[in-house]
Amino acid sequence: MIQQEEIRKLEEEKKQLEGEIIDFYKMKAASEALQTQLSTDTKKDKHPDPYEFLLLRKIKHPGFNEELSPC
């Protein structure tokens, strides 16, 4: 009887720990996805096109007579 009770407690503890492991991996995956997204956004902003704002506002490039066209 005592041995069966100990086995039952250990099985419950095992289930709880397995659930915590699953939750940990879910949080880890979400964190990695967010980190990847932020890293990608940072790389895009690292070397922005200096004339992109001109395209967005339809402003002519100084020194040129025509509007800039998207590359």
UniProtKB/Swiss-Prot annotation:
Give the species this sequence originates from. Homo sapiens
Q: What is this protein called?
A: Putative RNA-binding regulatory peptide
- Going by the entry's taxonomy, the superkingdom of the source organism is recorded as Eukaryota
Q: In which tissues is it expressed?
A: Detected in colon (at protein level).
| GO biological processes | mRNA stabilization; positive regulation of mRNA binding
Misc remark: Promotes colon cancer cell growth, colony formation, migration and invasion through enhanced stability of MYC. Expressed in colorectal, breast, ovarian and nasopharyngeal cancer cells. Higher levels are found in colon cancer cells than in adjacent nontumor tissue.
Q: What does this protein do?
A: Enhances binding of IGF2BP1 to N6-methyladenosine (m6A)-containing mRNAs, thereby contributing to increased mRNA stability. Also increases the interaction of IGF2BP1 with RNA stabilizers ELAVL1/HUR, MATR3 and PABPC1, and increases the interaction of RNA stabilizers ELAVL1/HUR, MATR3 and PABPC1 with m6A-containing mRNAs. Contributes to MYC stability by enhancing binding of IGF2BP1 to m6A-containing MYC mRNAs and increasing recruitment of RNA stabilizing proteins to m6A-containing MYC mRNAs.
Q: How does it assemble?
A: Interacts with IGF2BP1 (via KH3 and KH4 domains); the interaction results in increased binding of IGF2BP1 to N6-methyladenosine (m6A)-containing mRNAs.
